[in-house]
Amino acid sequence: INGMLTLGCGQRIGLIAGSGVGKSVLLGMLTRFTKADVVVIGLIGERGREVQAFIQETLGEEGLQKSVVIAAPANVSPVLRLKATQMTHAIAEYFRDQGKNVLMLCDSLTRVAHAQREIGLAIGEPPTAKGYPPSVFALLPNLIERGGVGRHGFGSITAIYTILAEGDDASDPIVDIARASLDGQVMLSRKLADMAHYPAIDLNGSISRVMQNLLSPEDFRVANMLRRLWSSYQQNADLIQVGAYETGTNPELDMAMRLMPGIIHFLRQDMNSPQDLSATWDQLRQLLGGA
């Protein structure tokens, strides 16, 4: 994320994932290793056991020291789940208005949409795409727009919303509306998770829309170079693995094949190993020094 999907204070981003691809672990890493003053976490619609496991194991004492956790498990009423979501945003806004840089994690925006769907259908709203009533599509942009930089440039809410791609379906209507409202997305790949490549971030499907404003032109060029090499290798992986690719046919693919072990090492990170922005960029510049 630091190197290929650089985030800025006040950015709103979606973490799009199916089940079992390392979403909760990545959220725990973001919470424990962030430089934010306060972390506000809303666990909406999760299983009660997962809430306890996230707090005790994934966050741990280190993560809890500067965190506020609001939990509304799946067994509570949809009204309470919506109230917990509003409280998560209100607490984040309170700290932002004090001039603090806040990291807000909302897990998950999809469960918030489900809660609003239950309420909307119960009061007689007509179902539209995948059974979601119109109030869902009005609620989500309003929530997302509550993040960002505070008045007069003091304080910020950097918001990360997890979005469940049901059945790994990236064309889900909640995914679509979130993409339209957010400043980028981090897509987690089941294929990478099956290969024990963690964090299982799919570079081809992920983007940070403010990254160009945060980096120097040279650093932005280096990041795009790695993205092109990764994409080129993935598109031709089958040919390479069966030995059908002839070296020298495509110079960029030749470079990708030569650098791929280093690229894979760069893109992986142990869940207990923090790495700051400067160390990430030193490693990336060294990897692509001659590119």
Residue ranges and their predicted role:
Residues 3-6, 10-291:
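P-loop NTPase catalytic core
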